[in-house]
Swiss-Prot record:
One protein family per Pfam: PTRF_SDPR
Family under the similarity heading: Belongs to the CAVIN family.
Native organism: Xenopus laevis (African clawed frog)
Protein's cellular compartments: Cytoplasm, Myofibril, Sarcomere; Cytoplasm; Membrane, Caveola
Recorded name of the encoding gene: cavin4
Location of region: Disordered: 155-184, 227-359
Protein name: Caveolae-associated protein 4
Domain of life: Eukaryota
Main function: Induces rhoa activation and activates nppa transcription and myofibrillar organization through the rho/rock signaling pathway.
Record's GO cellular component terms: caveola; cytoplasm; plasma membrane; sarcomere
A GO BP annotation: regulation of gene expression
């Protein structure tokens, strides 16, 4: 018995030891798994952080590229502007060079003329036969000169305008103007002043000044806001008038609505109408309107005309011949035509009659 009990105890102990060993192994495996998972999480975090950094760098690079593109566009625009300005400068330099050439040619011509004048002056100085006239702004030059020659005691003729032989050539001498020349000059000055006053430029300036004054007065009297309101109200009135005209044109009745079918009465009425046609023409022109009998007929437009006696007689004969051939139906109700006379204000003639007679 003791041996069995001891063996059982040993078995129980062994089972316990095996269970403890298995638990320890499982615990170690779980710890290793947790450690591995922690490492993986840290690696993933580092990867995500690196990705974020890379994205930020990419954004910075994109911004830098955009700025570079903008600067390149600006440089291209500046280059185009500079090329345009350079072309203009080249054109101006060409023009200046052409002008410089012209100026050089003119200067050369003037220098040649100056040389010629100097040579002539030298010749005149050598001969001592020259006279100098100095122009002054205050004293105007005369338009005409009158030279009076006097005979000297020696018998030689001398001019009053020329200085004596003893005077030097540099001295000045005055010339008296005639009264007619002065009057002519004053008249020409007045004419020139009048021309300047009534020239195109002066007239344009006066027009501009007058227009500016008128505009100022307009702005003082009527403000621009009020002027805009008046313009808007005028446009509204125009649009409303057009709409009213369109509505009237749409609502206006047609010519077919004004036509009336009137029944014939008989031979007696036709004969009476044929005989008394001339009288009815005169009476119809005097009567402006007649009352309608039927309720359906509301409005008719009838135009009356003067007829000659011959035409009335011919119409009456034609009606009699037509009604002899066809039997005249007896009307149940007599309907009188509604007549409305429209007289022209300008002409004194009686207007035409438009009556449709139908069975």
């Amino acid at each position: 018995m003791d041996h069995e009990t001891s063996s059982e105890k040993d078995r129980v102990n062994l089972n316990r030891l095996s269970m403890v060993s298995e638990d320890s192994v499982d615990h170690d495996a779980a710890l290793t798994i947790v450690a591995v998972l922690d490492k993986v999480a840290t690696i993933v975090d580092t990867v995500q952080a690196s990705q974020k950094r890379i994205e930020e760098r990419h954004r910075e690079m994109e911004d830098a590229i955009k700025t570079i593109q903008i600067e390149l566009l600006k440089l291209a625009q500046a280059h185009s502007n500079t090329s345009y300005t350079v072309n203009k400068l080249l054109e101006k330099t060409r023009k200046v060079s052409s002008n410089v050439k012209d100026v050089k040619s003119r200067v050369d011509k003037q220098s040649d003329q100056v040389q010629k004048v100097e040579s002539k002056q030298e010749e005149m100085l050598r001969k001592n036969k020259f006279r100098v006239v100095i122009f002054q702004e205050d004293i105007e030059c005369p338009t005409k000169l009158t030279v009076a020659k006097q005979s000297a005691l020696d018998g030689n003729l001398r001019d009053d305008l020329y200085p004596p032989d003893d005077l030097s050539s540099d001295e000045e001498y005055s010339v008296q103007e005639s009264r007619t020349s002065r009057l002519k000059k004053s008249g020409m000055k007045r004419i020139n002043n009048i021309k300047k006053a009534f020239s195109k430029e002066s007239m344009q300036k006066t027009k501009q000044n007058f227009g500016n004054k008128v505009n100022r007065l307009r702005t003082r009297i009527v403000t621009p806001e009020r002027r805009e309101r008046l313009r808007q109200s005028g446009e509204r009135l125009k649009t409303s008038g057009e709409r009213f005209k369109q509505s009237i044109a749409k609502a206006a009745p047609k010519k077919e609505a004004f036509k009336i079918n009137i029944k014939k009465k008989g031979k007696q009425r036709t004969t009476a109408e044929g005989q008394e046609g001339g009288k009815e023409d005169e009476t119809d022109s005097e009567e402006p309107t007649a009352k309608p009998i039927s309720e359906e007929v509301t409005y008719t437009e009838v135009v009356t005309v003067k007829k000659k006696k011959k035409k009335n007689e011919e119409n009456a004969e034609l009606l009699l011949s037509q009604e002899d051939e066809k039997p005249s139906p007896v009307p149940e109700k007599t309907e009188k035509p509604l007549l409305k006379v429209e007289k022209k204000a300008e002409s004194d003639e009686i207007p035409l009659v438009d009556i449709n007679l139908s069975q």
